[in-house]
Structure formats: structure tokens, C-alpha cells
């Protein structure tokens, strides 16, 4: 609680003398609106929709033509093969990691869709997908799914420090960041 400052009798009289002929201001023009909370979290419905939208591209029936010799790799036709070389050498370090161990194929598709959506939303260019060895189902299917997605620019078997032949480093096409328009 604030302390009241007491004015001397002289100061009070001087104040009243200076304020004669004035009237109290009526507050009728400015409406104070309550401050809105900033939206920092993405709504769960939106996240689920992004996940579904991005996993829509993954088909088990379509088999893209991938090179079966050597390590697992893919580069989109409009992307430089030098990007693939940089992935192989480990020049890109992944910012997001996805572990698919123990997931079903359907769950893996959804998680891949969520990873791609998260990378695009957060402007993350490189990510690592760890499919593991297991029964080789996800190891075989993951590259086929990724090659079908339009936002995947390239992928290559990860270097040893990121999982070796049990993981893939992927390059994701992200939208250029645009500053918000001012009114």
C-alpha cells in the first residue's frame, strides 16, 4: 500500500487557488480493452491436420525409382547433386531428430508427416530420421515414402555420428521467412 504524502496547509491552499475554475475530466473517449494472451502454442487440431496433410503423400503402392547400389540416397531432379554430397559428408547437422523404432508403418507415416510439418513451420532445413534395423520394414519403406513427398529435396544415409545405416539425413524445402506486414 502506498503512503499518502501530506501537504502543508499552505500548499493545499495554493493548490486550491490554482485549480479554481477548472472541472474534473470525464473519461469517456478511451476504452481500455483487456490484453489478449499471445498465441505461442500451435493448436492441437492444427498440428493433427498438418500431420495428416503431410502423411497424405506417403503411398505404399507407388514405388519411386531409387538407386539400390551403395548407400540409400535420393535427390529431387531440380536440386543440385552437390547437396547430396554435402549430406553424405556431414556438412549439414540436423536440428530435429525423429526416432521410428517400435512404430507401425501407419504410425511411422504420421510421424514423418509431423516431422516435415514441424520443419517447415520452424524453418528447419535438415533433420535426421532414425528408422533402425529391426526387420528392415521401416528401413526399406522410409526412403520410398520420403521420395514421394514434394517438400523433401534430398536424403542420404546418415554419417556414423547420426546413426549410420540405421538413419537418414533429410533436406527439407522450407518457405523463405517473410517479415510480417505492418498495417
UniProtKB/Swiss-Prot annotation:
SUPFAM superfamilies, from UniProt? SMR domain-like
Would I find Nuclease among this entry's keywords? yes
GO terms for molecular function, please? RNA endonuclease activity; rRNA binding
Q: Name one GO biological process term.
A: rescue of stalled ribosome
The residue ranges of the Smr domain are 98-173
Q: EC annotation?
A: 3.1.-.-
- Which UniProt key words apply to this protein? Endonuclease, Hydrolase, Nuclease, RNA-binding, rRNA-binding
State the family named in the UniProt similarity comment for this chain. Belongs to the SmrB family.
How the protein assembles, per its UniProt entry?
A: Associates with collided ribosomes, but not with correctly translating polysomes.
NCBIfam families reported in the protein's UniProt record: PRK04946.1
- Its job: Acts as a ribosome collision sensor. Detects stalled/collided disomes (pairs of ribosomes where the leading ribosome is stalled and a second ribosome has collided with it) and endonucleolytically cleaves mRNA at the 5' boundary of the stalled ribosome. Stalled/collided disomes form a new interface (primarily via the 30S subunits) that binds SmrB. Cleaved mRNA becomes available for tmRNA ligation, leading to ribosomal subunit dissociation and rescue of stalled ribosomes.
This protein's name: Ribosome rescue factor SmrB
